[in-house]
Structure formats: C-alpha cells, structure tokens
A protein has these predicted regions:
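N-terminal beta1-alpha1-beta2 module of alpha/beta enzyme domains
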Residues: 1-87, 188, 391-398
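Conserved, mostly hydrophobic/aromatic
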Residues: 3, 61, 80, 112, ...
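Hydrophobic faces of well-ordered beta-strands that scaffold small-molecule active sites
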Residues: 3-7, 57-59, 89-92, 120-124, ...
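An alpha-helical appendage that flanks or caps ligand/catalytic pockets
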Residues: 4-31, 52, 143-179, 219-346, ...
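Active-site mouth loops of central-metabolism enzymes
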Residues: 25-41, 93-103, 184-194, 249-252, ...
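Acidic (Asp/Glu)-rich catalytic clusters
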Residues: 48-52, 77-86, 109-120, 204-205, ...
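Glycine-rich, proline-tolerant flexible connector loops at the mouths of alpha/beta enzymes
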Residues: 58-76, 96, 130-133, 214-216, ...
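A conserved active-site cap/scaffold subdomain adjacent to cofactor or substrate pockets
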Residues: 195-223, 227
Length: 398
C-alpha cells in the first residue's frame, strides 16, 4: 500500500470570522499575506518531512476560499518537484474542465514530470460546484468539456513525431507540439475521483486509478462498480493499486491525545461546507437523478457506518467519524487495525490518501502525527497482503 499525505493548506485564522460563507464571497481583506506566507512555508516543510519519512505527497487546488490557499496546484507541484527527492507527487486534482487552455495544462504537467524525474501522478477532476463562479463555466457543459480536455492532454503528451491540429467542440489548436516531453511513458499515471457508481464504472473501463473522498463504508459500492467496468473492458480483475481512498488520520501514543488531534483535523469537515446556498448546486452541475437522490437524503453530506447507520459528516463527533470509516484515529495499533478493516471491507485498496493535517492542528502536532504514523503504521501497511483480486471480482460478478 502507498500512502500520500494531504492537506488543504487552509487559511484557518479566519474560520471563525466568515459571515456565513468561507467560499466564493469571503473578502480577501480577511487574509493577512504575512500570515499566509508563514502558513505556506509551514505546509511545504511538512511535505518535505513526508519525503524524508517515506510518505508520498498529494496536492489539490480550490479557488476563492479560506479552506484552501492552493489556488494553482502547479505552483505547489513546481516547488515540491524541486525540494523533494523520493515522494510521488499526486495532483488530485486538476479541474481541467474549468481550464481555458488544456494545452497549457499539458505543458505544465509535462514539465513537472521532467523536473521531478518521473514522480508525477496526474489526477483530472470535474471540480466541486463552488468552483464554477471562479471559472464562469456553464455547468451543463462541464463534463463534455472535461472529457475533451482530457483527450487533448493525452494526445498532446503522447504525440512525438511533430505537430498536430485539434478541432473540437470546445478547443481549437494549430501546430501542437509539447516541449519538454513527459518523463514517464506513455504519460504519467492518470487518477480521478468520483462519488457516483456510473462514473466509477466509466473510470474502470479506462483503467484509471479511482479515488473516493469521505465515502466511508459506502466506498465498497463504488469500488464494485469500478470492478464491473474494468472487468468488462479488460477481461480481468483490477489490482488493488487501482483504488484509493481519502481518510482523516490522527495517531498518538496516548489515545486521548489522538482523539484531540482527530477532533482538530475533523474541523476540515465542519468548515468545508460553509458556503452560501446558491453556490452549492448550480443548475445542471449534477444529473436530475442525482438531484432526486439528494432531495431524498441518500447522498452526502450523509455518511454511513459499517452497520448502515446514517450520519452527517459535517456535523458529528469523533466516534461517529471512526465508525463511518471517515477518520482513522487512536494509537498506532488502533489506526492500523481500523485501516485494514476498512480495506478488507472494500475488497482491497492500494492507496491511502491520508489527511494528516487539517484545520487547527499545529505544526508540532502534525510533525508528531506524521512521524509516528511513518514509524509504527506505514511499514505494516506496506507489508499487508491485499485480498485476492480475482476472488473479489468473481464475488462481484456473481
């Protein structure tokens, strides 16, 4: 199992002064650039520590929000591709459907892959609804635009015999010829995220690494949809390396201290949805079917524990988050057991996206959290034998 450390790089000093929305409309006068600089340096120091500890790195981007200062993920990738030496660098993700110029995306990511000497994992995502005001995109066209941008980027990265032209619905180019060419052949590994069984099946058909974020014990349903898509396309079961899950992680030698850390990290969940209602679900962003499920209360923010009990992940405590597989929290032995139980429930999982820092967790607490995890949990996760993929797939197909 690989483990990637992730933080939203939040500007948390303003979390208690938001006037009802931390996203889109929060005035940037509430951001002190000197404080922001200190926070950025702190977050990069923690990523450098991960490189030393054998933990890989995950970055993302969001816009116009105090929940995430990383508004351009390639800036973080550029910094980390130079100051780290061993860690894989995962971008999860890059909202390519929002971008005006996928050629620039192909050039940026190709350059990052070269500077890092082949350590880039590139995750392409649709993006959350709060991003639409910043990009001014039509939400009804977003997925079509996403897949055209995806197809163009892959073609640009894999064409090595001169220029080509592109005439699509959204993008038009002449004489495309990306320099430098990517380090990894034919291109860096592709990841994506979803909370939809339909989209999970599509990702399975493409063979991409699929990540789910905060889906708890509902993750197995999404993994099985992926397995069906993958088996239908490739005629074999997908390996555990095709599956990833983002979970909050708080570990300490003392159980009480671990719970304190877990509660601080869970501040990410409590603040991420503080946004004015009009920005939460713009018309056309999701399908009519998914909107109907939301109205019936069948989709997040509700999560589900292993026994099927529903919880609101944005307004609950540490115990419920542990029971739902959203938070792995406790002593090293407890955290290891929780992660393995979750992996077994899902039929295998090769990539843990570990939110080992969030919210008000201090630098000192974060360093201890990451260091203890790397010494007493990570080696056992790497040594753990995944469930037999073919046996899991046969059970899904039965």
């Amino acid at each position: 199992m690989r483990v990637y450390q992730f933080t939203e790089q939040a500007y948390y000093p303003t979390w208690n002064d938001h006037s009802g929305s931390l996203r889109v409309i929060l005035p940037n006068r509430k951001c002190d650039p000197h404080v922001a600089a200190d926070l950025f340096h702190r977050y990069y120091d923690e990523y450098q520590l991960c490189d030393e500890l054998g933990i890989d790195v995950m970055l993302n981007e969001h816009h116009q929000t105090a929940t995430c200062m990383s508004s351009s993920v390639v800036i973080g990738l550029a910094v980390l591709s130079r100051i780290t030496k061993k860690a894989r660098l995962l971008v999860l993700g890059y909202p390519i459907g929002h971008r005006p110029d996928p050629l620039r995306v192909a050039e940026e990511l190709s350059t990052i892959d070269v500077i890092s000497r082949g350590r880039l994992d590139m995750g392409f995502i649709k993006g959350i609804p709060y991003e639409i005001p910043a990009s001014n995109r039509n939400p009804t066209e977003l997925m079509d635009r996403f897949w055209e941008a995806h197809d163009f980027i892959i073609k640009a990265m894999t064409t090595h015999d001169g220029t080509f032209n592109w005439e699509g619905e959204f993008f038009h180019y002449r004489q495309v010829n990306v320099w430098p060419r990517v380090w990894q052949e034919p291109h860096p590994p592709i990841w994506s995220t979803t909370g939809s069984s339909t989209q999970a099946r599509v990702l399975g058909e493409r063979g991409y690494v699929m990540a789910t974020l905060g889906t708890g014990f509902g993750t197995r349903k999404l993994y099985d949809a992926y397995r069906k898509g993958y088996m239908g396309k490739f005629g074999r079961a997908p390996g555990a390396d095709r599956f990833a899950y983002l979970g909050l992680v708080a570990v300490a030698h003392d159980k009480e201290e671990a719970r304190k850390r877990g509660d601080l990290i869970a501040g990410y969940l409590r603040t991420s949805a503080i946004v004015h209602v009009p920005f939460r679900n713009p018309p056309g962003y999701i399908s009519a079917e998914d909107n109907a499920r939301m109205l019936r209360g069948e989709t997040p923010p509700r999560g589900f524990t292993k026994d099927g009990r529903a919880i609101n992940i944005h307004a609950t405590g540490v115990d419920d988050l542990i029971d739902a597989g959203i938070l792995f929290c406790g002593t090293p032995d407890e955290v290891y057991d929780q992660i393995i139980a979750f992996c077994e429930h899902c039929g295998g999982m090769g990539n843990l996206l570990m939110m080992g820092q969030a919210g008000f967790l201090t630098h000192e607490q974060t360093v201890d959290n990451l260091t203890l995890f790397s010494r007493e949990v990570l080696p056992r996760l790497k040594a753990w034998k995944q469930p037999d993929a073919e046996a899991v797939a046969k059970a899904v197909a039965a």
